């Protein structure tokens, strides 16, 4: 018999020994899983009626769940005891990234950023982009898997691909950075970012941004920053940016 375990640290709920399922718009009461989640629950995990687990709705809530009908195509569960806001953060983090030529590298970034903590991913094309389109639905599935693996209550938003000029014109309330490899850029992201602030960080394609694109971004209020001395792949730079912002906000002393 599989059981769910909870531990409490102050206001935070720490969930242990838990299988997690994703069900948009989940609420208290009887629910039916999708065929995909039903198959995973009954066939892969071999869960039985009476087994307990957790359900995330991707919108800020986690629920206790108990399997009522172990049907392999339409499993039914009873949800109760919602845990809302346990992983809320006082800041918003968005990263805009040019999809990599190899889709697996972009998917790797999406997985790791979701695990670490991110609110939104914006996709764009620029002058040096090698990929002009992206399978956003496939990317979203990668993020859903990461949400379940890392027991997150919120599913990050991922936007369709837009041109760079449109991206930098989109509104954002917070600090705006553009990561750029240039000898004249000495300001480090970790020094430029103000703890607790919302942040939007632009990460360029394999060939980096063009000088004209950087100038356009600066005119729109973006600040050029460095991520360190090493030359990083696009997806690595994006993960480093994500981790930097999260780490600064998790520090117990103000930076």
Describe each model-derived feature in a short phrase.
Residues 86-177:
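RNA substrate-binding interface of SAM-dependent RNA methyltransferases
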Residues 211-255:
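Structured adenosyl-cofactor binding patch, chiefly the S-adenosyl-L-methionine
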Residues 2-84, 137:
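N-terminal positively charged helical leader segments and presequences
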Residues 82, 126-129, 229-230:
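Short, ordered loop/turn segments at secondary-structure junctions
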Residues 176-216, 222-229:
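Active-site/ligand-binding-proximal alpha/beta "capping" segment
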Residues 29, 49-51, 61-63, 73-75, ...:
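A generic structural signal for short beta-strands and their flanking turns/coil linkers
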Residues 77, 155-159, 224:
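Generic structural signal for residues in well-ordered beta-strands
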């Amino acid at each position: 018999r599989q059981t769910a375990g909870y531990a409490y640290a102050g206001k935070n709920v720490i969930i242990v020994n838990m299988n997690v399922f994703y069900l948009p718009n989940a609420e208290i009461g009887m629910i039916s899983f999708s065929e995909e989640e039903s198959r995973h629950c009954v066939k892969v995990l071999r869960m039985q009626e009476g087994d307990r687990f957790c359900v995330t709705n991707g919108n800020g809530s986690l629920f206790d769940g108990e399997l009522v009908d172990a049907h392999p195509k339409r499993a039914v569960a009873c949800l109760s005891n919602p845990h809302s806001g346990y992983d809320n953060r006082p800041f918003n983090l968005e990263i805009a990234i040019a999809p990599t030529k190899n889709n697996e590298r972009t998917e790797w970034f999406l997985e790791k950023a979701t695990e670490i903590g991110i609110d939104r991913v914006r996709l764009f094309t620029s002058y040096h982009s090698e990929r002009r389109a992206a399978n956003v639905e496939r990317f979203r599935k990668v993020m859903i898997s990461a949400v379940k693996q890392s027991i997150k209550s919120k599913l990050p938003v991922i936007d369709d691909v837009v041109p760079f000029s449109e991206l930098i014109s989109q509104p954002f309330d917070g600090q705006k950075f553009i990561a750029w490899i240039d000898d004249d850029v000495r300001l480090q992201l970790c020094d430029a970012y103000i703890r607790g602030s919302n942040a939007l960080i632009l990460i360029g394609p394999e060939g980096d941004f063009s000088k004209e694109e950087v100038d356009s971004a600066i005119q729109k209020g973006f600040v050029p920053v460095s991520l360190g001395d090493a030359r990083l792949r696009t997806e690595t730079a994006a993960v480093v940016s994500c981790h930097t912002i999260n780490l600064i906000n998790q520090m117990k002393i103000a930076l």
